[in-house]
Amino acid sequence: WSKRSLDILDRLGVGQRLVDKGVIWNVGKVFRGDDKTPVYEFDMLPVKDQKRPGFINLQQYYAEEYLFDAVRALPNVDIRAGHEVTGLIQHKDQVEIEVVCNGVSYKICADWLIACDGNKSSIRGLMNLDFDGRVFEDNFLIADISMKDERPSERWFWFDPPFNPGQSVLLHKQPDDMWRIDFQVGWNIDREAATRPENVEPRIRAMLGDEIKFKKEWYSIYTFQC
């Protein structure tokens, strides 16, 4: 979460909760090959003594929990869990929304309907709207692991390291002794096979050492889009 994001979240009353839970970092380092000396360093907060850090690392489910708590505290918000929007009709001065819950359908009329339901938004689908942008022909393996480690809270990025030759790797520290490793794995891969523990864990040990003790939290593949 960037400083700008935290400034916005402050306006919603949840910025401090994110900072209190998150791992603060300002410094990033870039390495090449097996060289232990970074080829480049940067500081996301060159002007010190600001209210918020350059970045914090925090799992998304914590941010969603804090935002949900803030919304639930508002007197003019009605939260309806388990309700699915299945249809909508746009009128000149309002929108008519069809909702289904437990097999029962009902309708709501509102001035505005805001699509905040992610990149596979059913709202956007009902309106035949797509996310314009570019899909990069590459895949990345996310390995979220828990382990005890004294590495500094910095963003470390490798080009062509010996533990992932010809590709890149990113390492981030997160709360609760969680570490996120992003391995670039290429385009034409078997996505299911790439996330099997017997294929992921040799990568982790090649990077962190054979003796490292860690616990799997989450392995997945993502494709970068913007």
Predicted regions and their residues:
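A conserved beta-strand/loop element that lines the FAD pocket in flavoprotein oxidoreductases
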Residues: 71-86
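Active-site-adjacent segment of FAD-dependent monooxygenases/related oxidoreductases
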Residues: 1-72, 89, 172
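Conserved FAD-binding catalytic core of PHBH/FMO-like flavoproteins
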Residues: 69, 92-94, 112, 116-225
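Glycine-centered tight beta-turn/hairpin loop motif at sheet-sheet or coil-to-beta transitions
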Residues: 35, 101-105, 164-166
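Conserved beta-strand-loop-beta-strand element in the redox core of flavoprotein oxidoreductases
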Residues: 87-108, 113
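Well-ordered beta-strand positions in beta-sheet-rich domains
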Residues: 41, 107-109, 142
